[in-house]
């Protein structure tokens, strides 16, 4: 890509840019280290969130932001859902103590289980299980295994594909699932395009079995459907059938989409994924969960079947009839939604993913990426991540908090989540890689029409409280840890040496208009030369964006560490429409607008000197994360913080 012509446009572009910021996909600052102390903005925000939830639950008529709309959840409805909410951080172990618990009267008066939920209360986690299934596969399977066609793994599918190979017609593209093109990875990414429900119990004809006096013809008349026989459903009417019977029951179902077309949620896919993993490893999924994840992370209150000991039963959250909910048999559905866990254990699980405790760091980074888009600009899909693209408050409209200038950036933060909602239980785990933190919610209620919406409402309140606080805390720590003047030894001691080099790091002083938030270089003298005034930067005070950290955990940082930053001199917006609205010359659409929305990733590391990028700055940090010196890499000279 030829960029020299666009470099010349930089001064004029900077004059026109206004609005919100789009950086690399990643943090604006190093991740915050303090989420739990009395001085932490995150802890303060959590306290405010807890007060908000307390007030909400005490008001039996309405909650915050409620109106006359019939879709608004009342406090009474929220109060009827038991839930446990908790934070965690790979940098601050005490963050896991930030929790909020509410026990509904249904659970408080239940005949079985706990009557007051806490961090060690055991919930069913429903489809959050799918995240454990994929991680279990990543820990026990090779890349070759993940990319093998299912017909080479599951014999029944191979036989079906062979038996129907000679009957291929144009109609088969619509009615025949291409099992030889579907891999375990396609199932994990929800891109297989297969039928959603594999269990025959999800079929309307099952109503005939449940109510024999109402025949299939009556059902057909009620729904306007043609007559059918219950025997057409096959032998696998519930999740406790064998894997072979299950596969035979689903292999002839028509697909929803062709493989690798568009994400389509399928419980059936994760049942098949569990079958495939078990066949490839020779282990049942329950053994993989226990040995590869639960034991490895000391998740001592997590299970693949309902716990039955006296101690665990007393901690179990049981809504409604245990046989229909909490203790319902998993069968083949274990890999789709059969696990049990607690707030405490899920904090360990979330930290382990963020910290690459079980997987190599490179494998974790590869895994925590989108594999497909949805039709929405704010949601994407991974394996099996449900990725929420959270947009921080716009600095032009955020005026309510004293930290607004630090947290209101308008930037995008990707939340890697996995939800669950089945039977009497809902759940969600939210991982935020750029902050090394996250949170979980577990909930229970027999009122299925309310439980899911309540869970999502609490998640919205949590997200809107925690994300700005994490950004503001990261900004506050960055100011303390990096802002200041860095000088060469001869400059600071006024020796007779001719070396005269210094660098000043400031906050919110960048002259990249519209992108002036965060750390920046306000002055840079190298061997007596004003580098910012030189053609390298054209008089612009660049922003500094963190790129690589040498150590992440608190234990590793105790011996000191390094963090690399890239200098950014280009204006950015978070979409081309915003660039056009800002009046940038020549922006008419997505292609003319790409220079003002994604110029950083297009031009990063463009200019080198002696084999090193001139935009690379490496800071030395002490055990507290505070910078002690910086090396502008191209200058090959370390400057000490004064």
Model-derived features with residue positions:
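Fungal secretory targeting signals
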Residues: 1-22
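Catalytic loop of the DD-peptidase/beta-lactamase superfamily, centered on the K-T-G motif
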Residues: 23-106, 327-642
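Short active-site loop at a secondary-structure junction
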Residues: 41-44, 71-84, 109-187, 255-268, ...
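Residue-level detector of alpha-helical secondary structure
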Residues: 52-56, 136, 292
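Short, surface-exposed loop or secondary-structure junction motifs
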Residues: 78-81, 90-93, 101-110, 162-429
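Glycine-rich His-Gly loop
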Residues: 127, 192, 443
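Residues at alpha-helix boundaries and the short loops/turns that link adjacent helices
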Residues: 131, 143-144, 279, 283, ...
């Amino acid at each position: 890509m030829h960029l020299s012509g666009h470099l010349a446009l930089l001064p004029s572009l900077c004059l026109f840019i206004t609005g919100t910021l789009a950086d690399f996909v990643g943090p604006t600052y190093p991740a915050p280290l303090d989420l739990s102390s009395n001085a932490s903005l995150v802890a303060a925000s959590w306290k405010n969130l807890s007060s908000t939830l307390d007030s909400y639950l005490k008001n039996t008529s309405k909650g915050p932001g409620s109106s006359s709309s019939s879709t608004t959840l009342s406090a009474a409805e929220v109060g009827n859902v038991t839930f446990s909410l908790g934070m965690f951080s790979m940098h601050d172990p005490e963050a896991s103590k930030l929790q909020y618990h509410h026990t509904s009267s249904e659970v408080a008066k239940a005949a079985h289980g706990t009557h007051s939920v806490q961090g060690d209360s055991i919930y069913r986690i429903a489809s959050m299980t799918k995240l454990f299934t994929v991680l279990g596969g990543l820990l026990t399977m090779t890349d070759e295994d993940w990319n093998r066609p299912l017909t080479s793994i599951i014999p029944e599918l191979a036989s079906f594909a062979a038996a129907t190979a000679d009957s291929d017609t144009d109609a088969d593209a619509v009615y025949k699932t291409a099992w030889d093109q579907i891999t375990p990875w396609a199932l994990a990414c929800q891109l297989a395009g297969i039928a959603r429900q594999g269990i025959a119990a999800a079929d309307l004809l099952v109503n005939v079995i449940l109510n024999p006096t109402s025949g299939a013809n009556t059902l057909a008349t009620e729904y306007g459907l043609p007559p059918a026989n219950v025997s057409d459903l096959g032998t696998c009417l519930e999740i406790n059938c064998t894997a072979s019977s299950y596969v035979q029951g689903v292999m002839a179902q028509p697909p929803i989409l062709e493989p690798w077309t568009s994400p389509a949620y399928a419980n059936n896919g994760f049942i098949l994924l569990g079958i495939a993993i078990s066949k490839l490893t020779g282990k049942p999924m329950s053994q993989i969960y226990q040995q590869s994840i639960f034991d490895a992370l000391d998740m001592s209150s997590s299970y693949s079947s309902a716990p039955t000991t006296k101690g665990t039963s007393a901690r179990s959250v049981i809504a409604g009839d245990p046989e229909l909910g909490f203790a319902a048999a998993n069968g083949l559905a274990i890999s789709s939604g059969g696990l049990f866990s607690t707030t405490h254990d899920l904090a360990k699980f979330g930290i382990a993913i963020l910290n690459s405790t079980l997987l190599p760091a490179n494998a974790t980074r590869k895994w925590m990426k989108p594999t497909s888009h949805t039709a929405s600009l704010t949601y994407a899909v991974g394996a099996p991540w449900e990725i929420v693209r959270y947009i921080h408050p716009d600095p032009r409209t955020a005026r309510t908090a004293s930290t607004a200038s630090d947290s209101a950036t308008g930037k995008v933060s990707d939340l890697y989540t996995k939800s669950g909602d089945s039977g009497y239980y809902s759940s969600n785990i939210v991982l935020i890689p750029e902050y090394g933190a996250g949170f979980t919610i577990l909930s229970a209620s027999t009122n299925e029409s309310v439980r899911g919406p309540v869970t999502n409402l609490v998640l919205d309140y949590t997200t809107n409280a925690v994300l700005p606080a994490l950004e503001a805390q990261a900004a506050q720590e960055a100011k303390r840890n990096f802002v200041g003047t860095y000088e060469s030894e001869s400059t600071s001691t006024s020796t007779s040496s001719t070396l005269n080099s210094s660098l000043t790091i400031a906050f919110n002083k960048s002259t990249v208009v519209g992108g002036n938030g965060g750390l920046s270089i306000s002055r840079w003298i190298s061997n007596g030369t004003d580098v910012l005034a030189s053609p390298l930067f054209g008089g612009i005070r660049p922003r500094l964006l963190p790129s690589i950290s040498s150590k992440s955990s608190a234990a590793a940082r105790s011996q000191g560490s390094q963090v690399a930053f890239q200098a950014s001199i280009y204006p950015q917006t978070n979409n081309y429409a915003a660039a056009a609205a800002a009046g940038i010359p020549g922006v008419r659409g997505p292609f003319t607008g790409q220079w003002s929305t994604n110029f950083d990733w297009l031009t990063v590391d463009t200019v080198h000197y002696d084999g090193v990028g001139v935009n690379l700055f490496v800071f030395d940090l002490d055990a507290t994360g505070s910078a002690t010196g910086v090396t502008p890499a191209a200058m090959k000279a370390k400057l000490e913080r004064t």
